[in-house]
Amino acid sequence: MKTTINQVYKHTGEEVMIGAWVANKRSSGKIAFLQLRDGTGFIQGVVVKAEVEEDIFQIAKSVTQETSLYVKGIVKEDERSPLGYELAVTSIEVIHEATDYPITPKEHGTEFLMDHRHLWLRSKRQHAIMKIRNEIIRATYEFFNKEGFVKVDPPILTGSAPEGTTELFATKYFDEDAFLSQSGQLYMEAAAMALGKVFSFGPTFRAEKSKTKRHLIEFWMIEPEMAFVEFEENLEVQENYVAYIVQSVLEHCKIELNTLGRDTSKLEQIKAPFPRITYDKAIEFLKEKGFDDIEWGDDFGAPHETAIAESYDKPVFITHYPTSLKPFYMQPAKDRDDVVLCADLIAPEGYGEIIGGSERVHDMDLLEERLKEHGLDSDAYKWYAELRQYGSVPHSGFGLGLERTVAWISGAPHVRETIPFPRLLNRLYP
């Protein structure tokens, strides 16, 4: 019976065949232990000299790391195994012998591992992080489908920058200038006026010359937009969504979280509603904590966000930022025009902002005024402004950065471990 490692529980006491790679091995005179992996998981294969042919035992003793095999064996329950099972090996067929595999069980430096990222992905830790990433993506689609959202794919090549920044990757679009997308938000707003509630999931590109553990040059975002939804309801969608994906990871990635040594008690507390603090109150709090480098009108840096997050055991919304700090498309508060109806969701444990969202400007005159204030070319945004000309309604949305979210939930120390092939300031290889 051919099966995969994650399905062996269905075959207790039976002989199965698994296609696998040797992640590690150890042996004594009469027994060999093979740590096998097949992409679905890891299992220990036990080869007892007295119970197999001599040539099979010799293969087990001499097999090299990452050699590919077909292994047959009896599935046995084993409480000591994270999987709960082991394989009593009866035969081994070598598919391809690996020689001089560069990533050995010893410690390696970060640059070495990044140069060999195409191989580092095979390690138990990286495998666990990728499985958690996959579960977050799966749960994202499940959540938004259940909530009646329509998946929409905005363009990656654009003729304008959604936030009017200079941190763009420029390219030529035949005879025109074009840019790699920083966000699909403006297009998602258009889609929301057609379909009501929409979301996108795709790559974004920001030419930020940053080397922090929170930043990537290419990263993936989930960007929902909702017609007839105002600020508070937008926050409720965000907290319900984040709580949903955390609980899904807890349910479906127990082995992976255990592999990573993640303290799941901290994740078990992540349930809606999340606490809220206004920007004004956050400034007061930071000053009380001794941060003399921050004044009203300044943006928060990583130390400020971490200090605020440490006061809560859940993600916290920082709301109502100064208008001057935020992009042109954010709706001003009803009672004061110096702040906007926006929120950043700050993850616990020092992982920083994972969501930025706001109610969007829905008045055409105000939008045109904001474009002028930000020095943006109104012609480039003509189509976007027209959304306010034909049945404009209050609408809101947000963007969640996938890699930061994966880092927080998995406990990864750096976002470079949360995407298969990270693009960093000085890294475009492999």
UniProtKB/Swiss-Prot annotation:
Its EC number is 6.1.1.22. GO terms for biological process: asparaginyl-tRNA aminoacylation. It catalyses: tRNA(Asn) + L-asparagine + ATP = L-asparaginyl-tRNA(Asn) + AMP + diphosphate + H(+). Keywords: Aminoacyl-tRNA synthetase, ATP-binding, Cytoplasm, Ligase, Nucleotide-binding, Protein biosynthesis. It comes from the Bacteria. GO terms for cellular component: cytoplasm. It holds the Pfam family tRNA_anti-codon. PROSITE patterns: AA_TRNA_LIGASE_II (PS50862). Its main location: cytoplasm. It is found in: Cytoplasm. GO terms for molecular function: asparagine-tRNA ligase activity; ATP binding; catalytic activity, acting on a protein; nucleic acid binding; transferase activity. Belongs to the class-II aminoacyl-tRNA synthetase family. Homodimer. This is Asparagine--tRNA ligase. It comes from Bacillus velezensis (strain DSM 23117 / BGSC 10A6 / LMG 26770 / FZB42).
